[in-house]
Amino acid sequence: MFYEPEMNAGVAETLMLENRLHRAIEQQQFILHYQPKIESATGRVVGMEALLRWQDPDCGLVSPAEFIPILEETGMMLEVGTWAMRQALTESRAWRPMHGGPLRIAVNVSPVQLEQRDFVDSVRRAIDGLDIEGSPLELEITESTVMDDVDENISKLAAIRDMGVNIVMSDFGAGHSSLPHLADLPVNALKIDRSFFATVTTKSHSMTLVSTIISLAHALTVIAEGVDSADQAKLLRLLKCDEMQGNLFSKPLSADGVAKFLQRASVPR
């Protein structure tokens, strides 16, 4: 096999990024931003999705697309993922007085986390000693990740839900079909993949698919992500979608930004 200079440069760049990420963990350079989830019928803020960000002191905010794959490939995501759960729950405590009710806090779970044998215990350790009643924890796991080993994952997710943690299956409809298993999956909510909403107001096929998904999941909470226009929001309300999330309502916010958002929350309708 012949190696081109470009290949060597690529390997060196990856190794350098790995070293920077190790340093980022040691120096606590990771932060969380949050995007609100809105109840469609009332416009009320009902939750926040925590989004991992890397605040590099030299480069500023680094795109998640650049560093999350490396965290997953190297196994560093196990440590960072546990930190994200605790950090999100800790930061959310400050929002309770200004919100006036339970505010669900969603944290994304990567495939490498879910496949760990001790994943259930790691979640238990992450929430140990934290009050999750006022800010219930949600774990968002993609449909394709759940379906990779559906029988094993059903067992893990059921054990986690028994702790009082909600399970959201995200990117629903984008990959492996979970419909045959939907009745058996211990999930509280489905988050419909954002690809459906790019054309939901212009193509009848997209609208039919979204309407069908909402109807099939009538016993679950259905969340639409990637809602960026008032027309999309209006149609989703007509289709009885339970919750919405997207830049129409708010771009991802810092923890301080969430506090300000909740104080002046006035959601576009």
Where are these regions (language model features)?
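Catalytic core of bacterial c-di-GMP phosphodiesterases, primarily the EAL and HD-GYP domains
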Residues: E4, G10-A12, S40-E49, M76-E152, ...
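Structural preference for long, well-ordered alpha-helical segments in enzyme cores
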Residues: L17-R20, A24, A50-L51, E66, ...
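C-terminal helical cap(s) of enzyme catalytic domains, especially alpha/beta-barrels
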Residues: L21, R237, L253-R269
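Conserved ATPase "switch" residues in P-loop NTPase domains
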Residues: I25, R96, R161, S266
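Conserved N-terminal phosphate-binding loop of PLP-dependent enzymes in the Aspartate aminotransferase
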Residues: L209
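The catalytic core of metal-dependent phosphodiesterases that act on cyclic dinucleotides
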Residues: I105, R124-V200, I214-P252
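Active-site core of bacterial EAL-family cyclic-dinucleotide phosphodiesterase domains
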Residues: M1-I70, N108, M169, A224, ...
